[in-house]
Amino acid sequence: METRARKFSSSIHNWYLQNGRKNLPWRKNITPYRVWISEIMLQQTQVKTVIPFYKKFMLRFPNLKAISEATEEEILALWTGLGFYRRAKNIYATKEIIKNKYKNKFPSNFDDLIKLPGIGKSTAGAILSIAYKKPAPILDANVKRVISRHDDIDLQDKKSLANLWHMSETYTPSKKIFEYTQGIMDVGAIICSNKNPMCSDCPLTSSCKTAFKELKIVNKSKRQKRKEKLFFTLAHSKSEFLLFRKNAKTYWESLWIPYEDKNELSNTIFKEPIHSDTKKFKHALSHLDLEITINIFDYKAPFAIETNLEHQWIKKSDIHKYGLPKPIKNIIESHV
């Protein structure tokens, strides 16, 4: 097994030197901080989607010192459109721990990393192996696919996750870990793709147990996404929008949204507008299909409302400083 493991890791290493995606922005000027942000952004999100968000984030917060004084609001604002906003809240929580407990020094051992919000076993492994060049296994979606096919591990087996971690640990080399870790992620992303793997170009073809074989298509019972209707009232004057912070622990938590009505006819806290309009559209979340209706009310000037909900009249020129769900931001920007 040792010889097979060595062959596996050296094949990945050599392939990466020739074919790796070295131009990805998080693979330049590598620091633990930069690796951490990229790994969090890449959770459940494609590389091409992450790149512009990562670049924008790094311009605003290029290092731990820069982000140390950031508010949660500032981080959420930069996250608008990337989705899975819990990740942004975890970044805020983690940077606070690093600032207060570790004095702005990024942890460099597994036990400390794994305790930080949003950092699991695989993310900790990526930070250790890429930023610190310490041998540590990873098992993101791409690596899981490579190893499961290479060793013909049935992903439907209840023991598959434990087996995959065991093999990932076995294949992880003690040297040249930096190239290996990025290489196996790249092989999974570029070569051993989900539907059309390019076995002829794969560095692991000679030892892969499923190379050139027909893929096993697992017919998972696709869970029907729940549908939900949302009704909002967006009040705005010539220079400001009235927005409310969503405090419920659900999707869009802590983001700013228009007043959420219980139903289409429940606009009880607003006075008569000088003009009104209604927009209807659909928006898909990973687990939910939303049907959104927004009543847009125009007023001459901001006004006080009677509510215990956290709310604020926000200047149109300051909207970019607040975290908003993408569909809400699109509606607002169309009225700026």
Question: Which positions does each model-derived feature cover?
Answer:
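Intrinsically disordered, low-complexity, charged terminal extensions of DNA damage-control enzymes
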Residues: 1-22, 28, 189-336
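Catalytic cores of DNA base-excision repair glycosylases
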Residues: 3-6, 10-198, 204-207
